[in-house]
Amino acid sequence: KRCIIIASRIGKIEFPKLTVVTPKTVKEALAKVDMTWFNYDDITIPSEKTQTKMSYVKPGGNWKDIPPEIGGYGPNTQSNIMRRLDPDKPSITLSNFRKSNILHPFENRILSVSEAAAIMGLERDLRFISDSLSAKQQMVANGVTQAIGKFVKNVVLKKLDEFTYGKSKTSKVVFV
């Protein structure tokens, strides 16, 4: 869960009434990812030992699915460690998907940078640029979904527009 705080020195911020929409499933989000995505090949290849551990984790499951003689995780390990995404449900929050080992729903590996971006609702042409794969992965993890970003942008632009132009019909804000 994320908390967004918007403060204003120019007046009270009015939030529009929220409408609840059914979020995309992991399968729906990943369906649009193909080789044309900019960071398509930015992926961590796990060791053979790690792939063996991953093979035990069922969709929606986590490290607890791994037999103790293979696992090496303690009882206080967080539930999102070695978590395989369920293809038929919305994704969990993607914090650092590399460090937590957030698993692809069908393959024994973590998500690629482009797959994580697609789950966040980001577009194909958005580029994560760094010499470091882990830095690219962290860039995605540090973000918010595109829907949240657009919502915050529109709330802030509306207030700035009202402050600058008043609440007239000549408003300059374009909601995307």
Stretch-by-stretch model annotation:
Residues 2-176:
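S-adenosyl-L-methionine-dependent DNA methyltransferase catalytic core
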